[in-house]
Amino acid sequence: MDSNTVSSFQVDCFLWHVRKQFADQELGDAPVRDRLRRDQKSLRGRGSTLGLDIETATRAGKQIVERILEEESDEALKMTIASVPASRYLTDMTLEEMSRDWFMLMPKQKRAGSLCIRMDQAIMDKNIILKANFSVIFDRLETLILLRAFTEEGAIVGEISPLPSLPGHTDEDVKNAIGVLIGGLEWNDNTVRVSETLQRFAWRSSNEGGRPPLPPKQKRKMARTIESEV
């Protein structure tokens, strides 16, 4: 096993522990608590994949961070912070919408890279909107936290979420996954639109109906994908 992979996991475990202590003192806002929950699932998946105990890794991560801080001067720390671009956290969904359990009458699940796509194929002739919580850097989608498809009545009928055991994805991965989800929902004559926030940072453009401008090649690929799986 690569030593950098292990040390990265150890540091991530310790930093999660620090953020958890911060939130437990009621100093964190909703995005902080949301990320804690999502990152906890990711760490559990990584720990299982690597065969490492999270508590032991957290202690080792603390030692690594303490050693770095001892060697780092205040001036170097200021320069590092100034040189790192800051990401923003954007929310279409409330905490309740993100944490709500939902059920599928005709479940369909597909993996697209490190993203898991789930949808209820029993849903027909509905108006559906896609909402997402994600981070943005340089005015582009950086990391998807969670995307869900809602009917006008507020029912959840689809979802895209990162796989805890496969961290890391690009904005193109997210757009491709959204294309698959839209294709699956539209197959049953549902009308799907994407939230303005998601359109702006994932595609930087959209049509008036809230439908992202998918290229013809991707449309054909989506149709073939859904047709082969139904």
From Swiss-Prot:
Cross-referenced InterPro entries: NS1, NS1A, NS1A_effect_dom-like_sf, uS15_NS1_RNA-bd_sf
Protein name (database record): Non-structural protein 1
Listed GO CC annotations: host cell cytoplasm; host cell nucleus
Source organism of this protein record: Influenza A virus (strain A/Mallard/New York/6874/1978 H3N2)
Location of this chain's protein in the cell: Host nucleus; Host cytoplasm
Domain notes: The dsRNA-binding region is required for suppression of RNA silencing.
Any matching Pfam family: Flu_NS1
Family indicated by similarity: Belongs to the influenza A viruses NS1 family.
